[in-house]
């Protein structure tokens, strides 16, 4: 079978469902288009290209893309850290910024900025970091610079979301990047935010900036790999 060597995508597909993962609802259409296009190309390769040393490897690549697309837009089952005064990471990724900054847009005061960079292989779904009330939401059009650059926080397309509970208020931003040009956000001022529930997704990676009170006890350091809901 020409596709026998391409068992990895199907393994990823099976693992996605076997480990209580689901597919993000806003990505189903994207996955379907990937499968339609890749499936069509595989058919054309196997039907009309007579050289197996060309058609088989290329078909294998497209099968891998089909399988990986399902794994790529997965929604993992996470054990949420409890405590209304405990802020968890909005996204999976690497800590790239921990510094004191002035947040002028909504909080209007000095905060601790903690930024999480999501690469191509991280889970792309975002989760509410605390339970409380959504107090602020704004979409900012912008550029698509590399997300790990410091100036990307202000210049790139992003959304800003504020949440408040009895312990205080925080703000976080979903930043688009060079490849991640599709931000989905479910925030709506006045609505409840529940820690661990989905608050959106940034397709194809990018970055999250979180703005925390100066007296927050930061439990991570630069270079740490974090998981949404659990870190």
What are these regions (language model features)?
Residues 11-12:
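A domain-level signal for the mature, folded cores of soluble proteins
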Residues 16-231:
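Contiguous, well-folded functional domains in the mature portion of proteins
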Residues 7-8:
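Short hydrophobic targeting helices and cationic amphipathic motifs
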